[in-house]
Swiss-Prot record:
HAMAP family: Arg_succ_lyase. It comes from Bacillus cereus (strain AH187). This is Argininosuccinate lyase. InterPro entries: Arg_succ_lyase_C (IPR029419), Argininosuccinate_lyase (IPR009049), Fumarase/histidase_N (IPR024083), Fumarate_lyase_CS (IPR020557), Fumarate_lyase_fam (IPR000362), Fumarate_lyase_N (IPR022761), L-Aspartase-like (IPR008948). Pfam families: ASL_C2 (PF14698), Lyase_1 (PF00206). Its EC number is 4.3.2.1. One of its GO terms (cellular component) is cytosol. It catalyses: 2-(N(omega)-L-arginino)succinate = fumarate + L-arginine.
Length: 463
């Protein structure tokens, strides 16, 4: 077939060269955005008198037809037409005649593809924000059901202090809230229009960029045509935000994997989100959590891939920028899938409250309580720390826990110890007392839940 840009050339490219340079195998995902962008563009051309109203109406009818065909997956794309833009233009000309060739007046594929990607990400980021808030809702529900479920809190993966399981869950709620905030802020940079920037220098036609931007729902336009066609910061920002979101999901998945093991037994995954072994009949593997953890590296890779593509590009457009799309598409699909799986996995998991409770009665996570007990009686905390350290050593040598130590032994360490210290050793009491702002105390968790509901309630119907 003849190329829409073929006037300059006397030889045709080899078929394998065409295939190497074509992007239609993946950028066809932009078909709706491409057609909607073209409808806005030709509407603007008619308003400015660059094409007649009759020509514009004929072009728009043709584009609307192609849009309906696209929604029903009836369009057939060709490698020879290279990309989504030339495929649509070719189909349009075949449908309505040569007047379809006027669509590209005052426009380049450079600003066209940038517009498509802005429209695409604007829509997909909104979807991801919604899916993240749905996951946050699941976390709120689990936290509400586990306010008084006591578990070990960890540092260095060693038992540190008793905490509420709800407090642990809500830590991830606030991580996801930062992710939502980052995505929402990025929309300010996604929601600007490059349409009308041309190949790199603008156009001699009297176009109205603000009008076409308004038709497409953009909040403004790029102020520099070179920047408009060469900018991929908005994609990099999306990939960066998605990498942080996936990192948060991966951290939680790592804990779910540990907690579901025989060594912990804190939770049990629903059969819906676990698999078995082909050889070991007893196995119940947390495959979905492992896959989310693994797919995090995939999203990181997409970020670093585009950063590497961009680092050496002179202004303005370069064919290297064709490599900006597959990682973007892949990240959208990966993040959306992981969010939905994570929500279902957390919603259906069983919390073993008894095992968690046993864990905080068979360790030394209440040691800080004794140090605080002494400090509250006027002993410098460093001295209290030293005394409790010796008590823990004594217990490990005897094979007992702090609650098993007789009062006489405590008094040998410090005369400040009294009978009331055993009340301090209760994990439940230890958690309840930690009512500093943001702490694990039950009153603080109730306050945190109210704030959390306020953030997602309007969006997902929590009252």
């Amino acid at each position: 077939m003849s190329k829409l840009w073929g006037g300059r050339f006397t030889e045709e490219a080899e078929a394998w060269v065409e295939e190497f340079g074509a992007s239609i195998s993946f950028d066809q995902q932009l078909v709706n955005q491409d057609i909607n962008g073209s409808i806005a563009h030709v509407t603007m051309l008619a308003k400015q008198g660059i094409v007649t109203k009759e020509e514009a109406e004929k072009i728009k009818i043709g584009l609307q037809y192609l849009l309906e065909e696209a929604k029903q997956n009836k369009l057939h794309f060709s490698v020879e037409a290279e990309d989504i833009h030339l495929n649509i233009e070719k189909m349009l000309i075949e449908k309505i005649g040569e007047v379809g060739g006027k669509l590209h007046t005052g426009r380049s594929r450079n600003d066209q593809v940038a517009t498509d990607m802005h429209l695409y990400l604007n829509e997909k980021v909104e979807h991801i924000i919604k899916a993240t808030k749905q996951l946050q809702t699941v976390l709120v529900h689990q936290a509400e059901n586990n306010i008084e479920t006591i578990m070990p809190g960890y540092t260095h993966l060693q038992r540190a202090q008793p905490i509420s399981f709800a407090h642990h869950i809500l830590a991830y709620f606030w991580m996801l809230e930062r992710d939502v905030n980052r995505y929402e802020d990025s929309l300010k940079r996604i929601n600007i229009s490059p349409l009308g920037a041309g190949a790199l220098a603008g156009t001699t036609f009297p176009i109205d960029r603000e009008y076409s931007a308004e038709l497409l729902g953009f909040n403004g336009i790029y102020e520099n045509s070179l920047d408009a066609v060469s900018d991929r910061d908005f994609i990099l920002e999306f990939l960066s935000n998605s990498s942080m979101l996936m990192m948060h999901l991966s951290r939680f998945c790592e804990e779910l994997i540990l907690w579901s093991s025989q060594e912990f037994q804190f939770i049990e995954m629903s059969d819906q989100y676990a698999t078995g072994s082909s050889i070991m009949p007893q196995k119940k593997n947390p495959d979905m959590a492992e896959l989310i953890r693994g797919k995090t590296g995939r999203v990181y890779g997409n970020l670093f891939s585009l950063l590497t593509v961009m680092k050496g590009l002179p202004l303005a457009y370069n064919k290297d920028l064709q490599e900006d799309k597959e990682g973007m598409f892949d990240t959208v699909k990966t993040v959306e899938g992981c969010l939905h799986i994570m929500a279902g996995m957390l919603e259906t998991m069983t919390v073993n409250k008894e095992k968690m409770g046993q864990a905080v009665t068979q360790d030394f996570s209440n040691a800080t309580e004794i140090a605080d007990y002494l400090a509250n009686k006027g002993l410098p905390f460093r001295q209290a720390h030293e005394i409790v350290g010796k008590l823990v050593l004594h217990c490990t040598q005897k094979g007992i826990y702090l609650v098993d130590v007789p009062l006489e032994t405590y008094k040998e360490m410090s005369s400040l110890f009294e009978e009331d210290l055993y009340e301090v050793l209760s994990p439940y009491a230890a958690v309840k007392r930690r009512n500093s702002a943001g702490g694990t105390g039950f009153e603080q968790i109730e306050k945190a839940l109210e704030k959390a509901k306020g953030l997602v309630g309007e969006f997902v119907g929590i009252k």
